[in-house]
Structure formats: C-alpha cells, structure tokens
C-alpha cells in the first residue's frame, strides 16, 4: 500500500486532484480530512465562524487513524456529508490489498500535527490567491454557506484565507516532495504545472 498525503490552501484543488488520481488507479481510496471536522453542534459561534481552522478538527483522532493505517494497512474512516455539513462516521474502508490511499486536506503536511512523515509521497497543491477565492466563493454559494455573493466572498477572503496563511507560514509547501501548481479553470479543464522540491 502506497500512502499519499495531499495538502494545500483552501480552494487549491486538493480534493479534485485526489479524485482524479484515484480514478486512474484501480482500487485506490481517498480519505478526506474533512471527515475529521468537529461536528457543528459541538462548536460555539466563533468555532462556526472559523470552521476549517486547525482547532476545529479532531486532530488527535486524525493522527491516531493515520498511525493505525500506516501500521495495519487497513481501517475504517469518516467521510463528510456535504448536505448536513458534518462528518459521517465509518463510511470509507481501506483493505490490506488497497494499492493506494490518498489522504487530502488542509493540514496533512502541518509540522506539529505529526502525520506528514507517515506518507510515502507528499504533494502540495498551490494556487493563485484570486483563483482560490473565486472557487471558494462559488463553493460557499453552492453549499449554502454564503447567503449572498458578498457573504460568500467575505468568508473566502476572511476565515478561509486565515487558514491558508497558517498553512503557508507553517512551511507545508516546503515539506512536500512535489508541488503542483493548479491553474485557472477553463471549460472544466484545470491546467497543472509541476515543480519537484
């Protein structure tokens, strides 16, 4: 089993890349870090406003699950219900014969989370600020997190970009074995550029 960690700023294309890679490798499984969000009911108003910040994730559970995956080569993992905007326990299964597991999320390459060394290969997905904001704004509108275009854009430029700064300041990009530059979408096609560290 080959373990790949895919990190990057919000809206950079981590999930898109993970799904694309998994579709090319029969039996590959994607484990999204979104499954480790703390449930909305457990967060106060500030937690809901800043949801996606490091402290709004079940960090210890994530690390324990990654350690178990590395050690046992199998496991059951949470997914994320976008309709409920909450984690969904036990919906992703990895078997010993699974050839590749792609773990994607904001903080998979964070130094103090203690998981980046567990991956056989680490990818950081880079993206221009304005392109990421455009994607995030669209995502917030589609998911109902933005009651208007203005509210959705404010969230993307505010809370989401605060999380991006945490990731960049931590040196996640420099910890990657490969940096993929996600270009502007045109007609559903995303341009990728590669820069090996």
Question: Would you name each region that the model predicts?
Answer:
Residues 11:
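Walker A (P-loop) phosphate-binding loop of P-loop NTPases
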Residues 14:
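Conserved lysine of the Walker
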Residues 17:
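Hydrophobic positions on the alpha1 helix immediately C-terminal to the Walker A/P-loop
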Residues 29, 38-84:
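Conserved nucleotide-sensing/catalytic segment adjacent to the nucleotide-binding pocket
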Residues 141-191:
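Small-molecule kinase domains that catalyze NTP-dependent phosphoryl transfer to phosphate-bearing small molecules
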Residues 85-142:
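ATP-dependent NMP and nucleoside kinases share a basic, alpha-helical "lid"
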Residues 8:
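The Walker A (P-loop) glycine that initiates the GxxxxGKT/S ATP-binding motif of P-loop NTPases
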């Amino acid at each position: 089993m080959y373990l790949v960690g895919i990190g990057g700023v919000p809206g950079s294309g981590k999930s898109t890349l993970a799904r694309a890679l998994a579709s090319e490798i029969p039996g590959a499984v994607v484990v999204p870090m979104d499954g480790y969000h703390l449930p909305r009911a457990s967060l106060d108003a500030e937690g809901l406003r800043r949801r996606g910040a490091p402290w709004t994730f079940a960090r210890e559970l994530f690390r324990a699950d990654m350690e178990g995956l590395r050690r046992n080569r199998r496991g059951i993992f949470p997914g994320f219900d976008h309709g409920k905007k909450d984690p969904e326990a036990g919906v992703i299964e990895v078997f010993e014969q699974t050839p590749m597991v792609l773990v994607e999320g904001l903080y998979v390459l964070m130094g103090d989370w203690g998981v980046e060394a567990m991956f056989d290969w680490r990818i950081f997905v880079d993206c221009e600020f304005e392109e990421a904001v455009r994607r995030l704004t669209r995502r917030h509108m589609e998911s109902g997190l933005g009651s208007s275009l203005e509210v959705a854009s404010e969230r993307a430029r505010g809370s989401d970009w605060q999380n991006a700064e945490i990731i960049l300041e931590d040196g996640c990009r420099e910890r990657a074995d490969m940096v993929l530059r996600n270009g502007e979408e045109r007609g559903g096609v995303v341009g990728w550029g590669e820069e090996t560290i």
